[in-house]
Amino acid sequence: MNQNFSSMIDRYKYQQLRIGSVSPQQISAWANKILPNGEIVGEVTKPYTFHYKTNKPEKDGLFCERISGPIKSGICACGNYRVIGDEKEGPKFCEQCGVESVDSRIRRYQMGYIKLACPVTHVWYLKRLPSYIANLLDKPLKELEGLVYCDFSFARPIAKKPTFLRLRGSFEYEIQSRKYSIPLFFTTQGFDTFRNREISTGASAIREQLADPDLRIIMDRSLVEWKELGEEGSTGNAWEDRKIGRRKDFLVKRMELAKHFLRTNVEPERMVLCLLPVLPPELRPIIQIDGGKPMSSDINELYRRVIYRNNTLTDPLTTSRSTPGELVLCQEKLVQEAVDTLLDNGIRGQPMRDGHNKVYKSFSDVIEGKEGRFRETLLGKRVDYSGRSVIVVGPSLSLHRCGLPREIAIELFQTFVIRGLIRQRVASNIGIAKSKIREKEPIVWEILQEVMRGHPVLLNRAPTLHRLGIQAFQPIIGEGRAICLHPLVRKGFNADFDGDQMAVHVPLSLEAQTEARLLMFSHMNLLSPAIGDPISVPTQDMLIGLYVLTIGNHRGICANRYNPCNYRNYQNETVDDNNYQYTKEKEPHFCSSYDALGAYRQKRINLYSPLWLRWRLDQRVIASREVPIEVQYESLGTYHEIYGHYQIVRSIKKEILCIYIRTTIGHISFYREIEEAVQGFCRAYSYGT
């Protein structure tokens, strides 16, 4: 096992993953390994995978066992078996085939590399927006693309010597003899010396330009230019002002990019590749489907294309010195395009397709998007002690509670229930405990409720865009197959009760449970973390419900007193009681809200029936300048002053005996809920102080 790479992915030592450009030396250190016989392996030089007769990996190919390790643990390519880790069996190495006797899992992380015959620009840094190479060099992207793909060249700064650009320009203006003699020079052996000395093209030209400038000088010059543009002010021309604004934004991005390279100690020339890493074989497998037909990952075919073209370029550079320069440039362009297709198929236009007109999946297609390696496998992987279901409204729940279906609850807390069954000696072992859970015995639900009483759960709704996307709740067993939520927590999750799903997780460690209780409970996250406004406010269904609850008695006594339609709200019988008087002709009078709610439960009045409720002697209820609508006198001398929404009972001496307010059962219910909530808050506050 490569110690450098294994230490890099040690999950106990490292708790983060950083993605960035890597130097050729680091790629070589990850991929190269020294065999016991002193041979260094790691470079993939052949575009082959498996031999068609023996069905074994080809030597120095994409699945070579010498580079990536054995396919079967302890078995080399010859078929000999050696016990892994047994020193008595001799060296863990087959001298005949050169394969180490190690665990086959090494093929999941042992890399290889391809030594490119020419530098290749990384297409992510060139074509992706923003183009880091174009920003750093302060050159148009189209010009850099033409340079990378060998469409034109630039002259190296050599004084008093002809340059390639001057010679190409002289073709149109020089005499006819020189027009035909100079191109012949480019097919001679002397052209190589001239080309390497005076002209530069392809990715090597980009690499030279990236390695040349000082990043601190780039930052200083960009800052000076930005200040000069800022001092100029408005030109009066809208188009020129927008152009200056775009230039200033570009300079800011350029300074940030140069600062990033300095801070991370990354050399800009790493954006041009000299060594191309080869993924471990297990991450790009070849499998056999029904009928023995092999099915390969698209990455393998793209790697083969790169190796074919790279070898085609390597042969004339190493064996023949009479190869025309234009042919070499053309082959370098093909290598660049092959690597582009491997990294990001289709970024330069039409994507590469197979024989069935199917687009090959490149590195970018494998790792990006919802089904990519990061979001699906690393970030969105399935975890234990978690479930998922549709959310519905639980209006009777407290703000910090949620209702879990029985199926989800028993599955999430199964291990805790098993421990409880064994502790209470209901079951003697795990097997018997599981059988009792499957049979759904009553004792199981009792233990489950006891376990859930002291264990919070986490609810998460994707996408988790802010911290309120994950909140903690105290679970209770609910009926049905959906997760019940208080409607006030809907806004924090940005959820709707129209089929949205939520995931539920069980925090296992004591630290996680403490964090859930102290920081993540829903009743402790009532304010928006972004702007500080209340986020647990009634919306949608709750507002409609409150409106319907209090819709009665909104036009006063004058609109309803003599309206025959209101008579259907009253019963035909006369009820005489000490607490209230109820007749067909009169609106009922109640001494307390409990009496009114009792009459509603007995269906003597409905939710919207106007009634008179005795109220405390509060002068704020009485409007001093209001004139009574009607005054009713009784035989004992007392009289009632009836106003729009209240009435005052006075004695003969005009003293106020009592006050009645005109309301409905809906208003009473709403008021009592608010009153109980305020009293509960005051009690909690007094206990806390």
UniProtKB/Swiss-Prot annotation:
Major location category of this protein: plastid
Co-factor requirement: Mg(2+); Zn(2+)
Keywords: Chloroplast, DNA-directed RNA polymerase, Magnesium, Metal-binding, Nucleotidyltransferase, Plastid, Transcription, Transferase, Zinc
Any Pfam family hit: RNA_pol_Rpb1_2
SUPFAM superfamilies in the cross-refs: beta and beta-prime subunits of DNA dependent RNA-polymerase
KW Transmembrane helix (keyword) present: no
MF terms (GO), sorted A to Z: DNA binding; DNA-directed RNA polymerase activity; magnesium ion binding; zinc ion binding
Binding site for Zn(2+): 76, 78, 94, 97
Gene3D superfamilies reported in the protein's UniProt record: 1.10.40.90, 2.40.40.20, RNA polymerase II, clamp domain, RNA polymerase Rpb1, domain 3
EC number(s) stated in the UniProt entry for this protein: 2.7.7.6
Note on cofactor: Binds 1 Mg(2+) ion per subunit. Binds 1 Zn(2+) ion per subunit.
Annotated Mg(2+) binding sites: 496, 498, 500
Catalytic reaction list: RNA(n) + a ribonucleoside 5'-triphosphate = RNA(n+1) + diphosphate
Biological process per Gene Ontology, one example term: DNA-templated transcription
One Gene Ontology term, aspect cellular component: chloroplast
Subunit relationships: In plastids the minimal PEP RNA polymerase catalytic core is composed of four subunits: alpha, beta, beta', and beta''. When a (nuclear-encoded) sigma factor is associated with the core the holoenzyme is formed, which can initiate transcription.
Family indicated by similarity: Belongs to the RNA polymerase beta' chain family. RpoC1 subfamily.
Protein's recorded name: DNA-directed RNA polymerase subunit beta'
Organism for this UniProt entry: Illicium oligandrum (Star anise)
The gene coding this protein: rpoC1
